Structure formats: C-alpha cells, structure tokens
C-alpha cells in the first residue's frame, strides 16, 4: 500500500541524512561549532525537498523528475510523491529503493572513514579537505 511505501521511504531518507549529519558532526569537537558544519547539509537537504514540490505541481512525468527520483538523496522525497500522483510503478519504487539501500552502506563506510580521521583531532574544527587528504595518504 501507499502508506507502507511512504513509511519505508521515510526510514530510508532518515538513515541517509542521519549518516551524513553524523559524519559532518564528527568534524567538530565543540558544541558551538556544530551549526557551522550542519548548516550546509541542511541547505543541501532542502534541495530535494523543494524540488519534489516544484516538480509534483508541474510536469509530473518529466524526464528530470524521473531521473532525480532514482538518486538516493532525492528518492525519499520524490518517490512517495510520484507514487501518490500515480506516475510511478511499484517496479520503479523497488529499483529506487534498491539503489538507496546499496548507497546507504557506502555512505556509512565513508562517514566512518571521516569519523576515524577526524576524531583524532581536538580543538578547532577539522576542515573536510584535510580529512579527505588524510584519506588519500592512508
């Protein structure tokens, strides 16, 4: 049913963004600095949210809407909208869910790498570029 699909997408979307925010939060050691790393992610998470509304009120069967709805950060917002609007089949829902479930462990692995490289630093905020540079050397 549609309600079950919406709940599944909510859980998958929550997991994707929770892992991303966890990785970002590991870059700071002081509570006061959390907003500086979380604000860009908040803004990025608003893009799929707003696009899902804009596309749902426009041409619901556009190629852009269809392609974006398969990308993991966009799928939790766009696939439920496409399902409710009747422009998505259960096969498309399953494919998008499969892509998101493959993406999630990769995201967790990347977040874990960021965390392990950033946790050794204390004091000032660790720039993401520095963490990624350490990853290249390791």
Task: List each model region and its residues.
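Membrane-embedded alpha-helices and immediately adjacent juxtamembrane helical segments
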Residues: 18, 22, 45-48, 55-60, ...
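Short helix-loop junctions at transmembrane helix boundaries
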Residues: 1, 27, 82-84
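A structural motif at transmembrane helix-loop-helix junctions in multipass membrane proteins
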Residues: 7-44, 56-58
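Alpha-helical transmembrane segments of multi-pass membrane transporters/translocases
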Residues: 4, 8-9, 87-117
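Hydrophobic alpha-helical transmembrane segments of integral membrane proteins
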Residues: 43-59, 125-126, 130-138
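Membrane-interfacial helix-loop-helix junctions in multi-pass membrane proteins
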Residues: 53-102, 138
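Junction motif at the cytosolic side of a transmembrane helix
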Residues: 23-29, 102-138
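Alpha-helical transmembrane segments of multipass membrane proteins
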Residues: 13, 17, 21, 45-52, ...
């Amino acid at each position: 049913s549609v309600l079950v699909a919406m709940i599944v997408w909510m859980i998958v979307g929550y997991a994707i963004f929770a892992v991303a925010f966890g990785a970002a939060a590991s870059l700071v050691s002081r509570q006061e600095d959390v907003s500086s790393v979380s604000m860009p992610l908040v803004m990025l998470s608003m893009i799929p949210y707003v696009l899902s509304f804009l596309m749902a009120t426009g041409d619901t069967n556009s190629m852009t809407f269809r392609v974006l709805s398969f990308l993991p950060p966009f799928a939790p917002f766009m696939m439920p909208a496409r399902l409710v609007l009747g422009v998505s089949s259960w096969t498309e829902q399953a494919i998008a869910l499969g892509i998101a479930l493959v993406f999630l462990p990769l995201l967790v692995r990347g977040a874990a790498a960021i965390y392990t490289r950033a946790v050794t630093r204390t004091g000032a905020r660790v720039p993401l570029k520095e963490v990624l540079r350490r990853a290249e050397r390791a």
